[in-house]
Structures are given as structure tokens and as C-alpha cells.
Amino acid sequence: MKRLILAAAILATACQPATTTTAAPPAAPAAAEMPPVTIYHIEGRRSERIVWLMEELGLPYELKFTRGNIGESMAAIRAVNPGMPVAPTVTIGDQVLTESGAIIETIINRYAPGKLTPPLESADYANHMIWMHHAEGSLASRVIADYRVWMIKPPTARSPLVDSEAEVQFAEDYLATHPWFGGAEFSAADIMMVFPLNFAMQLNIVDKNQFPSINAWKAKIEQRPAYQAMLAKARPDGIPGSPPALPQHAPSGPRPAPALPAAQPAQPAQPAKPAQQ
């Protein structure tokens, strides 16, 4: 009888549905203690991104530039970073950093882990990372190159290659279905994308009226208190020495198909040479 009871208990246990537990996502690592941060800045340059980042995070920093004097601001940068005098040049303790995207990721990962970044396991994280790097790797490089060429020779037709309008349209299409470049929430990717999109639109590289989703996104950006604080501190008098807008941008419309190289005619086969005796 005892054996029958034991067998029934084992059978009942085996027939119970299996339960699974979902592990909670790992907690963000603790923030490291932040040494003094100094941002060497020139008005209207990418160093604005770092000022804006620090305002969003509520972290302390020192901002160094000579108001309205690009030459003196650059001299201060050269004194700290003679090998690569660019804005931004940022010192964190005794370390000198350049490249705004790298500076942003370093500050967030060390001193504000989990902030302005979607959760690692989310779908938004991959999109956030794409736009973090697309801002300079694809968008800025394209619009700046087109600006320089078109200032010398205004365009009369769309390029068959990926041109500035195609780059900006790519961002427009994404924002048509997402509120921010970070996906559902504002992220550091939005900080990265403002500079090249402003450059493209304010300098008439593209027709700004063609991109309603970008314009709506920019309006939200401009209402953020941290962005307004950045403008007041980093651009109090506008942008000295701002480049002129293009007299005309490329016509709108589809890009022409790239021309394929002409096929080369087949060469007639050469008769085999007789073997040498």
C-alpha cells in the first residue's frame, strides 16, 4: 500500500505544469566617483554636446572658452591638447579626451550608468547605438562634404550616391515612427544627432520644410531645460563666424540610378602556338 501511495505522489508531481521564472535584468553598476571635468569649448562646435550632456545629468563641470573670440578659445585648447586641438577637448582628472561621442559614452558609463541609455536588453538599445554612431560616421561626414562641394559648385541634380537629402530622409523616416532617436525615451543619441541635423537645415544643404518629423523632434529638444541651459552657457551670443548658408541645395526628388560601367567586348581567342622543338 505504501508503495502505491508513493507511486501516486510521484505521478502527480510529474504531471504538474512546469513553472519558469524570468530573471530580472542586471542592475546598472554603481557610478564611480567623478574627478573634476573641464570642457574646452568654442561656440557652435561639437563641444556643445558635452555641456548639454552634463546639464542633462546634473553633473558638475568647468566650461572654458573666451566669449566671442575663436582664436583665444583655440589657444586655450592648444595649451592642453597640442597634438589634436579640437573642440571638444575635455579633461577628466588628468586624462585628456577628444571625440564627442566617445566622451559622452565615457561619462555615462563611468559616472552615470544607466542614464540617457535604453536598457541593454531592449530593442531600443540597438537603435540608440546606431544613431550614436550614425551622427558622425554617416550623417555629419556627408552633409559637411556636400556643403564644401556645393559652396564652390551649386548642384543641379541629385547625386546617384547617398547624398545629404538621403541621409536626412533616413533620420526623418525613423522619427516618423519613434519619438526620439533613443526609441521611446530621450537618450544620448538625441544629443549626438542635433548638431549634424542643424548643420544640414540651417545651412540650406537640404530643404528643411521637407522633414516634418525632424522639425517636431527639434521643437521638443528646444523645450528641454538642459538644452536651454546649454545655449545660455555655451552660446550666449550665438555662433561667431558661422558659415554662410548655401545659395541652393540639390533639387528634391528620387536619386538617379548609378551608371554601370559599360561591358567590355569579348576578346577573340588566340590560336595556340605550336610547341617549340
Residue ranges and their predicted role:
Residues K2-A7:
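Sec-dependent signal peptide recognition
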Residues A12-A14:
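C-terminal motif of bacterial Sec signal peptides marking the signal peptidase cleavage site
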Residues Q16-A18:
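Bacterial signal peptide processing site
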Residues T21-A32, R255-Q277:
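Compositionally biased, proline/threonine/alanine/serine-rich low-complexity intrinsically disordered stretches
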Residues T22-R158:
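GST-like domain detector, emphasizing the conserved glutathione-binding G-site
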Residues I39, M54, V90, A171, ...:
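Residue-level signal for nonpolar/aromatic packing positions in well-ordered secondary structure
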Residues M132-Q223:
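GST-like fold's C-terminal all-alpha helical module
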Residues A234-P261:
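Acidic/histidine-enriched, glycine/proline-rich intrinsically disordered or flexible terminal extensions
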